[in-house]
Amino acid sequence: MSFLHLAIVLPFIVALLIPLFYRWTKQVHTGWLVLPIPVILFIYFLTFIPKTMDGATIVSMPWIPRLGINFTVVVDGLSLLFALLITGIGSLVTFYSIYYLGKKKERLSNFYTFLFIFMTAMLGVVLSDNLIVLYLFWELTSISSFLLIGYWYHRERSRYGARKSMMITVFGGLMMLGGFILLHIMSDSFSIREIISNADVISNNSLFIPAMILILLGAFTKSAQVPFHIWLPDAMEAPTPVSAYLHSATMVKAGIYIVARFTPLFASSGVWFWTVSLVGITTLFWGSLNATKKNDLKAILAYSTISQLGLIMALLGVGAASLHFDTLSDDIYVMAIVAAVFHLFNHATFKGSLFMMVGIVDHETGTRDIRRLGGLMRIMPITATIAFIGTFAMAGIPPFNGFLSKEMFFESMVNITQLQLFDASTWGVLLPVVAWVASVFTFVYSMIIFFKTFTGKVKPYLLPKKPHEAPFGLLLPPIILSIFVVGIGLFPNLIAEPILEPAVRAIVPGLSTDFSIHISLWHGFTPALLMTFGVVALGIVLFLTHKYWKPWITTKVPKALRIGKTYDNGMYYLEQGSYRMTMFIMTGWLRTYLNYMLSAFILMMASVMIFTQALDFNFSSMTKVTVVDFVLAAVILVTLVGIVFSKSRITSIILLGAMGYTISIFFVISRAPDLALTQLIIETISVVLYLLVFYHLPQFSNIEEKPKWLSMKTFLSIGVGVIITLVSLSAYNTTFYDSISKYYVDNAYVEAAGRNIVNVILVDFRGFDTMFETAVLSIAAIGIYAMIKLRLTKRGENDENE
């Protein structure tokens, strides 16, 4: 295992150890013990920056090589950017949680176990080159996020939010798995690099579009794109450190990563271009609009996250057009990819600081409701400064980093009208219009967060706690992120060459060697800057009149667009349908369950034999049936009929024993004396046990059965018998593989020094099978003995009490 593989699994290993050392270190906050892990990983991944500027680092470890499944790790510009965000933000969140979560009140071992499992899952997603390994880590993110969102499981809303996120993201994951399988069918490889290298061949396959749609479903569900965005607002029931980590920099960016990673493969299709662009721009608009009507600070940030994710998704969709040009060094559509990568980084910084700021406000005032907040700037000046930087960066105001990437976003949306592909020059005019309107709402909700929380009058009578400034431990992580927001805004080229360029090259492999990124705070009077002026002007008007139009958009949204209600209704009817089906199937009668199982067996086996044409029998090669065989078969048939229609238990037992002894004669004729002896012993013991047990049972009563049950029993009995007979004949006449009998004959004496082949098979070749069967029987015997002994003990106690 390489250091890269160890870096991925290290948080998971630590997560497994946390419950062990937690009980011995309760005097120390668990966060202090685990904090070095993400810090060390962040420093480790920083060392890859020079390497990714020269190319990707690839390390592979065999896992299931025969199936083409290897744990291959690739560190290129894109995966490194995400790895730095995962470990960097993870370090700050871990530090923040030490002061946010009380040592005595919270289940810290659970929290950090779930958090570090999630960290491993995210690192695995962004660093894995193998599709199957990526999918396993992908689903681990869903499971660990479910545990984190439902951390306060005693709250009904937390459980609801956790279930909702799990249902939607796991659904998307399964769809994405289907897309991965289709890619494997088309390319005969699970390696993402190999699949992308064969993009020209794969794009002509009939499975290309279905694979694309399935993979996009997985990406859209994870990154909360419309209409799958409904899980993210309910996920805000998680503790604020979880929201700051999962819902600003990591989990919700996983879908963005998938779209960016597969852009070189699918960008040739107009379906990819329009689907990603339109879903992204729709999500941008819908998220920003809904954020303006919320009163909970976390809810506003949730919808703002949805909106910002849509912005990045739209940029990736527009940027896909860049792969259609031969000369990419000065292609204007490459700048859309640059803007997407840049805003992905910027969003993690300002949104992470804002989530932490909201956590501080909630922690120190006891509420997140903006109707109860106000005037906190005088009481919490440092927190107010953090909020000012974060909200103005999110609104796209200079000199913060959000302004730069927002300008690049506007420029990319305007340039799409010049694209002579996919009819973008006509329909593409809608994208800059919607983008501008959505940006106006983005400005409005950003101002709502800051001004309605920190300006105006303090309302102490509405606050559960007396507000005060947070301790330095809570303030330090958002301060660090705010420094990045300002620093990158003033000096954006600090990250342009070492981080942004390698990431863009990973998404657009055909970039020329002289391609470089240069970002400046002042770039002249451009259409993008004029759009920003318009956003600010109209945004101020809408903010000042917010109380007048907010009720209108709150009440006038058509019911058809309330997707959350549709989800709730769907889950309700699904649960009701499942309950009714369960009540129909689970009758409590053993015969009902047997009927279901036997009916399914008959239908499945009959269907398989018919569709595989397995009913072609050759009787000429079979052993000839003698008179003795006929007599023995007749005896077995007579005893079976007698057992079925017998009115006496004793008679049934005797007939059952007679049938077993007759079968042993078959073994003697077939020259299998060991089997015959075993059969005789088993039959004798069985008859004796039956007689002993039946002696203690109540008197046999003949229950009159309804004709329909008798008919069902008859049909199933005959059906199973016929199917077993046909399967036996088919298996005898159909040989897909060479018989293994010759292997046992040749090796029984040589390998095991045994002349009795049956004994050698049971004891040597299938020794483990025999041993475990013996173990199962022993466990069953112990269970029966314990039940009998417990019953006798209770009976003795009762007698003694009497």
Where are these regions (language model features)?
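Conserved RecA-like P-loop NTPase helicase motor core
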Residues: 654, 681-685, 690-694
